[in-house]
């Protein structure tokens, strides 16, 4: 208020002086117009900045705030997934020792229909079909869709979100992980083929798995929900090819193909990265998953 009064008095004094000097009146009006214009634009830019900040806060407040569970750090036994051969015959990879670092947290639940819709509504994620209500897991997403969602969530939260590596998913799954290795000692390839056929038939018994609301398939010993339920979950692990030594104890990975990624669930499946429904095609290796979804891990930065 005092500032406005002082400015008014100043302008009145200036105007009185200008009346006595008409030749300077035009210069005064030009200067006054410039000052008013500058103040107007300053006000407009300040208002725009406030609106931008409010919009960012709104997006962050409506973004997913997932419950998290810490993946136990430490050393554990892990069997790599891929196409491996010994003496040119298909075989399973041996167990390897892997280490999980500290500070990695995984979503307690898969990304839901509501969570994914927030990204779509923000104009960042691809529109995909959804089944059921907001508290159902989002399905019908490709690996590429999941990566875009992780990038969006990282951007709006300022945190690092990504798909889990397969060994991280296995560690988090605990007793819910299904090791689909074919334990057979015979060197006859037909024996392995028959064993794989029986395993596939057992995995395909019954109808399509039922989609349930979040938590509908229960929790594992770590408190993580819906692992190995109806939804197969994308990992960032690429398709691997390799050979085993004659004794079968050492694995040499010869190549990786990252146009195909590993999905984990009731069994392992390698799926082409742009596929959203593997039931109609696109499963590169293994039985096709019933539904494709995902959950993310958050990497802490110390």
Question: Where in this protein do the model-derived segments appear?
Answer:
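Short glycine/proline-rich turn/loop motifs
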Residues: 96, 126-133, 276-281
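Disulfide-stabilized, aromatic/cysteine-rich ligand-recognition loop
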Residues: 2-51, 55, 219-220, 254-302
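A short glycine-rich, aromatic-capped structural motif
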Residues: 62-127, 137-144, 229
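Short Gly/Pro-enriched turn/cap motifs at secondary-structure boundaries
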Residues: 95-96, 213-216, 284-288
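Functional-site microenvironments in short loops/helix caps that host divalent-cation chemistry
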Residues: 132, 143-278
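Bulky hydrophobic/aromatic "packing anchor" residues in well-ordered structure
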Residues: 71, 76-78, 106, 116, ...
């Amino acid at each position: 208020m005092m500032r406005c009064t002082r400015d008014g008095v100043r302008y009145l004094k200036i105007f009185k002086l200008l009346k006595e000097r008409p030749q300077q009146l035009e210069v005064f009006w030009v200067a006054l117009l410039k000052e008013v214009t500058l103040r107007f634009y300053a006000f407009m830019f300040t208002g725009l900045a406030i609106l931008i900040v409010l919009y960012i806060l709104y997006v962050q407040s409506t973004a997913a705030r997932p419950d998290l569970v810490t993946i136990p750090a430490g050393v554990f036994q892990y069997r790599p997934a891929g196409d491996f051969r010994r003496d040119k015959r298909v075989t399973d990879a041996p167990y390897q020792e892997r280490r999980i670092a500290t500070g990695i947290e995984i979503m307690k639940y898969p990304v839901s229909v509501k969570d994914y819709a927030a990204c779509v509504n923000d104009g960042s994620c691809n529109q995909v079909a959804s089944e059921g209500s907001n508290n159902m897991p989002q399905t019908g997403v490709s690996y590429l869709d999941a990566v875009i969602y992780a990038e969006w969530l990282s951007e709006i939260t300022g945190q690092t979100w990504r798909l889990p590596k397969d060994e991280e998913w296995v560690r988090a799954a605990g007793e819910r992980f299904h090791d689909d290795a074919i334990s057979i000692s015979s060197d006859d390839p037909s024996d392995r083929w028959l064993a794989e056929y029986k395993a596939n038939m057992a995995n395909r018994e019954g109808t399509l798995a039922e989609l349930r609301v979040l938590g509908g398939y229960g929790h594992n010993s770590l408190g993580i929900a819906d692992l190995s339920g109806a939804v197969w979950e994308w990992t960032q692990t690429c398709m691997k090819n390799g050979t085993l030594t004659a004794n079968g104890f050492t694995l040499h990975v010869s190549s990786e193909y990252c146009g195909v990624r590993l999905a984990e669930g009731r069994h392992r499946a390698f799926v082409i990265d742009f596929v959203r429904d593997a039931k109609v095609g696109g499963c590169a290796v293994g039985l096709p998953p019933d539904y494709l979804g995902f959950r993310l891990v958050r990497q802490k930065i110390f």
